[in-house]
Design a protein with these regions (language model features):
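C-terminal interaction segment
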Residues: 1-12, 16-140
């Protein structure tokens, strides 16, 4: 995916486990969050958490200690929380299975191979499998 194609006047990108404050005592972190710049205005930015929903949430694998939940259960719960908070699209890239899960509100969630195009937003697509193959990665 070519991040340079994302209009940085229209969108704000937060990464590296950026925090979201869903409600009291309910905070989540995201690998990559894409906000509409009209939603995440400068007065909504602080040191801890964004309290407005991103337009897109992108996650790579489940990288938390799962005491009593399966990986699938954790993904489902987190995805439901994000969609309930107002996120328009949640995308999970899963390296072990080489799959991508895409969830949007009011629609069936999709699971596809990661060598298929995935629209992130505004016609910008990501194809992890193709990218890795082009780079000669053994993980393609």
């Amino acid at each position: 995916m070519d991040w340079k194609k994302i209009d940085d006047d229209k969108y704000v990108i937060l990464k590296n486990e950026a925090g979201l404050h869903i409600d009291k005592g309910n905070n989540l972190a995201g690998d990559l969050l894409i906000f509409d710049s009209q939603t995440l205005t400068i007065d909504k930015v602080n040191k801890r958490y964004a309290d407005v929903p991103p337009k897109i949430s992108i996650e790579v694998d489940v990288d938390v200690a799962l005491d009593e939940l399966t990986e699938h259960s954790y993904m489902s719960i987190k995805t439901e929380k994000l969609l309930g908070f107002g996120v328009e699209k949640v995308i999970w890239f899963l390296t072990a299975s080489k799959k991508v899960m895409i969830a949007t509100p009011g629609s069936d969630w999709q699971l596809r191979d990661w060598d298929k195009d995935v629209e992130i937003l505004d016609g910008i697509v990501c194809n992890v499998g193709r990218y890795l193959k082009e780079k000669g990665s053994e993980f393609a």
